[in-house]
Design a protein with these regions (language model features):
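Phosphate-binding site of ATP-dependent enzymes
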Residues: 2, 7-89, 93-95
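Short, histidine-centered active-site or binding-site loop motifs used for metal coordination
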Residues: 1-2, 122
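ATP-dependent carboxylate activation and anion-phosphoryl transfer catalytic cores
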Residues: 82-148
């Protein structure tokens, strides 16, 4: 839960290593388990939410032989849109985040499903979004705070 950029992720199978999991819990004090979605090999979508509104998304595709879509793990970003289901999920989450006074977040969707965590401390991908779309969401965020 404190990790970022695809770090501290274990892929467990039916033959998972109990000692490996025990060491992980001992080191980090907790473990979050998420169902593996096979379609991750086709990429995930990082959705950017600013002040409760969906502002855009990028598709992140893992490098060959990897299950991690993170750019820092070798994933590649592509321009993308959101389908109705993805937009609905993202909008609902955005409203909830705004109620909790979280003004900037990134959520990750695979095949239309939220994969578990909401990135509020490290919602990366803005440089790639700007490169692909020309839109500067970082500037939009800071301008939207009205700190002048």
């Amino acid at each position: 839960l404190d990790g970022y950029a695809g770090k501290n992720i274990l892929f467990l199978t039916k033959k998972f290593s109990k000692p490996k999991v025990s060491l992980f819990i001992k080191k980090y004090n907790y473990l979050m388990v998420q169902k593996y979605l096979n379609k991750v090999k086709f990429g995930d979508k990082r959705v950017f939410i600013i002040k409760g509104k969906v502002k855009g998304a990028i598709k992140r595709v893992p490098r060959a032989g990897s299950n991690l879509s993170n750019i820092s793990q070798g994933g590649t970003a592509f321009k993308t849109g959101l389908n109705k289901k993805e937009l609905k999920i993202s909008s609902l989450i955005g409203k909830s985040l705004l109620k909790d006074k979280i003004y900037f977040a990134g959520i990750d969707l695979i095949d239309g499903y939220l994969i578990g965590d909401i990135n509020v401390t490290s919602p990366t991908g803005l440089p790639q979004f700007k490169d692909l779309t020309g839109k500067n969401l970082a500037k939009d965020f800071w301008d939207g705070l009205g700190l002048k």
